[in-house]
């Protein structure tokens, strides 16, 4: 069993249900690994990075998951700032010998928000795919307009069933990441 410190926004936290209904809780059930939930609703990538840098983590932590970007878009932070925050996060994790996994921002049921999220997902993939684990949970959520409408309570926060599906989908990918790193 390994432990992963998970930093992010409401989608890490499991809003509106809370950490026990988050996708991390489901991944924990499936894998038997421990996923520490450090999600804070409303956080932007700079907030998440700041918490990561200032929080005292258990000494045995070797893996960090990071999910952010949607709140940055909502608050009209430029994509450039988000990418800089992700790069700083990767460099910080490398300096502390943490293995970083970046969770791609989810496509929402809000088309105006997706005009910014879709390009951000592409740029994150282009910039970080060769440098760290990228975890794309979108297949568990869906992509068609009907799937997206059904997946979210309010256009951006998943239903409890979708959080479970995200965790079930993520579990083997996370297990593979942890096993691969463990064999180094």
What are these regions (language model features)?
Residues 14-16, 110-184:
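Catalytic His-Asp segment of secreted/periplasmic serine-dependent ester chemistry enzymes
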Residues 37-39, 104, 136:
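Residue-level recognition of beta-strand->loop/alpha-helix junctions
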Residues 23, 27, 51, 82-89, ...:
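A general structural detector for well-ordered alpha-helical segments in enzyme core domains, enriched
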Residues 57-61, 96-97, 177-178:
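Glycine-rich phosphate-binding loop signature in dinucleotide/nucleotide-binding domains
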Residues 67-68, 89-120:
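Active-site segments of SGNH/GDSL-like serine hydrolases
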Residues 17-20, 46-85, 102, 108:
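Oxyanion-hole/transition-state-stabilizing segment in secreted/luminal serine hydrolases
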Residues 1-41, 46, 51-60:
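Serine-esterase "nucleophile elbow" of acetyl-processing enzymes
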Residues 31, 96-97, 130-131:
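Helix C-cap/helix->beta junction micro-motif
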């Amino acid at each position: 069993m390994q432990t992963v410190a998970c930093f992010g926004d409401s989608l890490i936290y499991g809003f509106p249900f809370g950490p026990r209904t988050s996708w991390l809780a489901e991944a924990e059930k499936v894998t038997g690994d421990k996923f520490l939930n450090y999600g804070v609703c409303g956080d932007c990538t700079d907030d998440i990075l700041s918490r990561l840098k200032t929080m005292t983590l258990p000494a045995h932590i070797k893996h960090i998951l990071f999910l952010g970007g949607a709140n940055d878009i909502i608050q009209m932070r430029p994509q450039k700032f988000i990418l800089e925050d992700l790069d700083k996060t990767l460099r910080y994790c490398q300096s502390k010998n943490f293995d970083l996994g970046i969770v791609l921002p989810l496509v929402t049921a809000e088309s105006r928000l997706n005009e910014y999220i879709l390009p951000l997902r592409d740029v994150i993939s282009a910039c970080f795919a060769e440098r760290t684990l990228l975890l794309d949970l979108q297949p568990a959520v869906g992509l068609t307009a009907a799937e997206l409408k059904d997946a979210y309570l309010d256009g951006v926060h998943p239903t409890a069933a979708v959080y479970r599906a995200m965790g079930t989908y993520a579990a083997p990918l996370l297990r593979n990441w942890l096993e691969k790193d463990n064999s180094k």
